[in-house]
Amino acid sequence: MEDAKWWNVFPLSPGLLPKFLLFVSVVSVANSMQCYATLKFTKRVYSGKPFEVNGLSSRTFGTWTLLAALVRFYAAYNISNGAVYDICTGTFILAGWHFFSEWLYFGTAHIGEGLTGPLIAATTGFFWMVSQRDYYLALPAQ
């Protein structure tokens, strides 16, 4: 039996995409916790109209983010499962739609420290997953 190593917690599938999914999942869990603890960081994301951020909207956003984290975490370890892969891709589509619409249509978000990270994660995740779909779905199940 191979010695247990701390890095064995990382997804075994080749490439960086599964590790990226694990990373954004962990970051999203941390973001979800802060959404329940304080409005400070949620108001940074929605800096265009911070007065619209309240406890309920922050907790709802935290719950939505936690659900996306769960899907992305599962996909990190099941990257060759087509249904899981597609649902995970959908989380990036929804996140991108949300953040871009809050910025460009509703005006509740402005480009800055609160919005830049989520926009980068959503667009990077989406384009990476779309471009690598055939490769990862051709892998044997882990």
Identify the residue ranges that each predicted region occupies.
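Cytosolic juxtamembrane helix and N-cap/initiation of the first transmembrane helix
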Residues: 1-28
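Juxtamembrane helix-loop boundaries in multi-pass membrane proteins
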Residues: 50-64, 88, 114-118
